[in-house]
């Protein structure tokens, strides 16, 4: 039993270290030049250029806490993940796709959580936001409706009405995508959808923001490939595409149909005699 416990602890440590290395490569640790007094506990140090460095060990712990809260809600449709920042819209849609929660990508419609006369009115049990500054409207409405809020908070983010603040860089496209990918994987592991020791087959690149020009360029390239391997049109078809060997063979004669029972063919089908009975 003790050996199994040590092995499990070693696996968890290695997984945490791998996640921290991924967050380092995605610049999750880079804060801003300003620091809110409520975010000082999550700051590791300050660089010479004035940028605050976030302690990624505490970021990973807060991701685990947020995943436990998400798993504790029975119906995933009672959770709304939202991002008004363009860099986080693709990430929230992918997070909603793999975890089953509802996503709102784009501008928040005022009154979504407070005005019952609206068609888009909703009463979620949990709210997940990308940035407390850009998503200030849903935070205020969630506070009026007593909705718990989870948010990715930078060093200068306001912490008012935020129940679980995950310290991280919430302004970079790679950082936001990496955070939502890690949170989605932790949620699926706690639900038992994927094994803890099993590597998730979904790439983190799918959660990254893509420029519209880049997506359009890839779409044009796919269209060109389909045009190259498409069928030849009627105006482009020529006999040169058929080899000479295909023309030299003899044409097979069609199989003649068997004569109908009771019908006598004399000289041809025109002169066939009409049967005496059986047509009725």
Swiss-Prot record:
Family designation: Belongs to the universal ribosomal protein uS2 family.
Instruction: Name a GO molecular-function annotation.
Output: structural constituent of ribosome
GO cellular component entries:
cytosolic small ribosomal subunit
Task: Give a short account of what the protein does.
Answer: Required for the assembly and/or stability of the 40S ribosomal subunit. Required for the processing of the 20S rRNA-precursor to mature 18S rRNA in a late step of the maturation of 40S ribosomal subunits.
User: Which Pfam families does UniProt cross-reference here?
Assistant: Ribosomal_S2
Biological process terms from the Gene Ontology for this record are: ribosomal small subunit assembly; translation
Domain of life of the organism encoding this protein: Eukaryota
Which InterPro entries does this entry report, sorted A to Z?
Answer: Ribosomal_uS2 (IPR001865), Ribosomal_uS2_CS (IPR018130), Ribosomal_uS2_euk (IPR027498), Ribosomal_uS2_euk/arc (IPR005707), Ribosomal_uS2_flav_dom_sf (IPR023591)
Q: Where in the cell is it found?
A: Cytoplasm
Q: Which species does this protein come from?
A: Arabidopsis thaliana (Mouse-ear cress)
Sorted alphabetically, which PANTHER family does this protein's record hold? 40S RIBOSOMAL PROTEIN SA
Q: Which CDD domains match?
A: RPS2
Q: Which residues carry this modification: N-acetylalanine?
A: 2
* Keywords from the UniProt entry: Acetylation, Cytoplasm, Ribonucleoprotein, Ribosomal protein
For this entry, the protein name equals Small ribosomal subunit protein uS2y
């Amino acid at each position: 039993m003790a050996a199994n416990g040590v092995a499990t602890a070693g696996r968890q440590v290695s997984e945490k270290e791998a996640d921290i290395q991924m967050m380092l490569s995605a610049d999750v640790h880079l804060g801003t030049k300003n620091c809110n007094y409520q975010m000082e506990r999550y700051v590791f140090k300050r660089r010479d250029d004035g940028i605050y460095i976030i302690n990624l060990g505490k970021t990973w712990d807060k991701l685990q806490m947020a995943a436990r809260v998400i798993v504790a809600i029975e119906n995933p449709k009672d959770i709304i993940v939202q991002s008004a920042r363009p860099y986080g819209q693709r990430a929230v849609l992918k997070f909603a796709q793999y975890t089953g929660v509802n996503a709102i990508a784009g501008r928040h419609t005022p009154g979504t959580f407070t005005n019952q006369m609206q068609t888009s009115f909703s009463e979620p049990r949990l709210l997940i936001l990308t940035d407390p500054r850009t998503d200030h409207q849903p935070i205020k409405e969630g506070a009026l409706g007593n909705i718990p809020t989870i948010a990715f908070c930078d060093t200068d983010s306001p912490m008012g009405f935020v129940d679980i603040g995950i310290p991280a860089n919430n302004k970079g496209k790679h950082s936001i995508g990496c955070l939502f990918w890690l949170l989605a994987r932790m949620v699926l592991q706690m639900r038992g959808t994927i094994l803890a020791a099993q590597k998730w087959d979904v790439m983190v690149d799918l959660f990254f923001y893509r420029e519209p020009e880049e997506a359009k360029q890839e779409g044009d390239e796919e269209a060109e490939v389909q045009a190259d391997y498409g069928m030849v049109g009627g105006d482009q078809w020529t006999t040169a595409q058929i080899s000479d060997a295909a023309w030299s063979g003899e044409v097979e004669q069609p199989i003649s149909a068997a004569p109908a029972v009771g019908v006598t063919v004399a000289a041809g089908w025109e002169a066939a005699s009409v049967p005496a009975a059986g047509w009725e």
